[in-house]
Amino acid sequence: MAAVSGTFNMMHPNPRKRRDGLRRLGLLAGACGQLGTSVITLCTGTRDPEDMWRSHPENDVPEAWQDLLASMERALEIAEEYEVTLAFEPEVNNVVASAEKGRRLLDDMQSSRLKVVMDAANLFREGELPHAEEVLDEAFELLDEDVVMAHAKDVKNTGEVVAAGRGELDYDRYLENLRGFGFEGPLILHNLEEGEVEGSVAFLRTKLGVNATYSEQRGR
């Protein structure tokens, strides 16, 4: 098993909700050994009280960042206790909405237990895909050494998230960047229905065939 999801809203405006999420994270971390993994994936959350995947104007206020640091500090204490790694995703609707903020979080926390899940589709808001090369290159320049896992889904220029191969994400550039720093971790299909699996697998196999160097690295 590559990882388990410990996702909860680390930025929920209700402190009790944040504490409950941390409590559940502790239970999950304690079970990781039996589950056969040492990686727990997280999102950094949003001030939206109803939907942790919806942006909120208060995500960018200084108090929100301080709340995130407090939640992450406690989460990393749990990670240290159970000897697991926490891997967060930069995501446009969360407080860590960009690779730049992801780098800031890593630098603020200074923990070997904190790493990154790279999900290229999460880095683009509506209308931003024409700048994909610039955005992807910057993301890997800032985060490459801390990436332990990659997600494979897709996004349209409207901002709609879809299964891999059904959107407009520059997968050649995405895989080229993964290849460029010698990534050998898992690349996991994400955000798709059962009926979409076959098509997305075929799409990725084609792309990985084109990116032969990456395929060879994964085969070692």
Task: Outline where the language-model segments fall.
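N-terminal glycine-rich cofactor-binding segment that shapes the pocket for flavin-like pterin cofactors
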Residues: 1-3, 12-13
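Short beta-strands and strand-loop turn motifs
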Residues: 3-6, 42, 83-90, 118-120, ...
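Short, flexible segments with low predicted structural confidence
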Residues: 3-5, 50-51, 74-78, 149-150, ...
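Residues at structural and domain junctions
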Residues: 7, 54, 61, 88-91, ...
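Feature marks short, surface-exposed loop/turn motifs that line or immediately flank catalytic pockets
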Residues: 7-10, 46-50, 94, 124, ...
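Active-site acidic/histidine proton-transfer and metal-coordination neighborhood
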Residues: 11-118, 214
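Histidine-acidic metal/acid-base catalytic patches
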Residues: 15, 36-38, 73, 98-220
